[in-house]
A protein has these predicted regions:
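Beta-propeller folds
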Residues: 126-138, 161, 181-183, 201, ...
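Beta-strand C-termini and the immediately following turn/loop, strongest in propeller blades
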Residues: 129-136, 154, 165, 173-179, ...
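C-terminal structured domain segments
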Residues: 394-395, 402-413, 417-420
């Protein structure tokens, strides 16, 4: 009887142990799913981990390792079952992001993980986006510079007029041509490639859409069909769908461009100068400028760089680089010498280096084309990256790594020749032709 009681006790103990283990296994935290499930990540694409139990965020952070180390924002759903990683900047192209959770991670019930978890995602290479063909109805394409693999992003019969890439590299805003001189402003999500109608410009020609850095306001150029109407700049509020018309009816406004710091720059053909507007506090500035055209913002939003014509004689009027400091409200001529003409400035995606096109106006050094130069604003040093006298170099687009740059070149000695998009390493000067008959290059993750 004693033997039977002892045997029964052992069986009961084993049963209790098994039951406890089963209960513990059922209550223990596990990872049910990760997103994305497969393939690479790009841009600021979030990574999500779904748990079966409510988790302790502090415990997660103590046992979490991200390789390579990278600044991310970690957010949780209200139930603490969904953890999302969003990079502060775009994921590093060409790297593999690895997220590891070691043993010891606990749930809200203080029950720990029983095993380690490691997940990895390759980061897709940065792609070049461009318009093609230059001699027809152009649409948006992208190409992998390493493999040469290309993909068509849009297929609008009327063609894409122009486009811009958002500051967070998540979307492209672009305008398409419709019948009777009208257009539409569209957007494309660079992760899903889903397209959305933003503004149906049924009575106007809308062009040059530019989204503010905070993603709240879309600036664009609008030309109404009314006789005698001048182009203007409109601001479309994406939150409340309201619209603001900048300027007055008798002013000719063009070329809107948002800074990373939230200022909008645009050119006023009527008053001959650049206007700057901060929508947060309604602050305005004005920079007199006879030349106009496109400018470029520095990565920190402090400097605006453009070109200005200088009258230095009866027959000599070169255009020089004009740097405007929004903090000090000062201007500086960056072009040295009266016989140099500098145009088309484009700041790097980081730091204070910028690209521009230069040609000499002196009779002995004059050439049909303009060459690509790079200048560092901090050191004042400048370097020529091309030396092809017949070619015009323009449309400079810096790679996010700050080392490579795409540009368009035109043969000024043979205007029937198609434009080409080239890629150059700004350190070595090594250049590679990527696209024939394409234009307007830009970079997307």
């Amino acid at each position: 009887m004693v033997f039977m009681n002892w045997k029964t006790g052992v069986l009961i103990a084993i049963g209790l142990l098994i039951g406890g283990l089963l209960i513990g296994w059922q209550l223990s935290p596990r990872i049910d799913e990760v997103q994305p499930l497969e393939g690479g990540i790009q841009g600021r694409q979030p990574i999500s981990i779904y748990f079966n139990r409510a988790m302790d965020p502090k415990s997660i952070e103590e046992h979490l390792e991200l390789t390579p180390p990278y600044d991310v924002e970690i957010s949780w759903d209200p139930e603490y079952k969904l953890m999302t990683f969003t990079p502060v900047n775009i994921w590093p192209s060409g790297e593999t992001v690895i997220i590891s959770l070691s043993r010891g991670v606990r749930s809200k019930l203080r029950i720990p993980f029983w095993q380690e978890f490691t997940f990895s995602w390759p980061v897709n290479p940065t792609s070049l986006v461009y318009l093609w063909p230059a001699d027809g109805k152009s649409n948006l394409y992208k190409v992998n510079p390493d493999s040469g693999e290309s993909q068509q992003l849009t297929n609008h019969p009327g063609g894409v007029l122009d486009y811009s890439i958002t500051h967070d590299n998540d979307q492209i805003y672009y305008s398409i041509a419709e019948g009777s001189g009208t257009s539409k402003i569209m957007s494309i999500d660079l992760q899903s490639l889903e397209k959305s109608l933003i503004i149906d410009c049924s009575e106007t020609l809308c062009a040059l859409p530019q989204l503010s850095a905070d993603g709240e306001r879309l600036a664009y150029e609008a030309i109404t069909r009314e006789p005698g109407a001048l182009p203007g700049i409109r601001i479309f509020n994406l939150r409340d769908q309201s619209e603001l018309d900048l300027g007055v009816p008798d002013e000719y406004l063009e070329n809107p461009l948002w800074s990373p710091a939230g200022w909008l720059a645009f050119y006023n053909q009527t008053t001959k100068g650049y206007q700057f507007w901060n929508p947060v506090n309604d602050t305005t500035r004005f920079l007199p400028n006879e030349t106009g055209g496109y400018g470029s913002w520095s990565a920190d939003g402090r400097y605006f760089l453009t070109s200005e014509i200088l009258f230095v004689g009866d027959t000599l009027a070169p255009r020089h680089l004009q740097l405007y400091d929004l903090v000090e409200e000062t201007t500086q001529d960056l072009s040295v010498g009266n016989f140099l003409e500098d145009l088309n400035p484009s700041f790097s995606t980081s730091g204070l280096a910028f690209a521009f096109s230069r040609k000499s106006l002196s009779p002995q050094d004059w050439t049909p084309g303009r060459q690509l130069w790079v200048m560092d604003l901090e050191t004042g040093e400048s370097t020529s990256l091309t030396d092809e006298v017949d070619y015009q170099h323009t449309s400079f687009a810096w790679h996010p790594d700050g080392e490579q740059m795409a540009y368009v070149r035109y043969n000024q000695a043979m205007l029937s020749e198609a434009p080409e998009i080239w890629l150059v390493n700004t350190t070595s000067g090594e250049a590679l032709r990527l696209i024939i008959n394409g234009f307007a290059p830009g970079w997307i993750p």
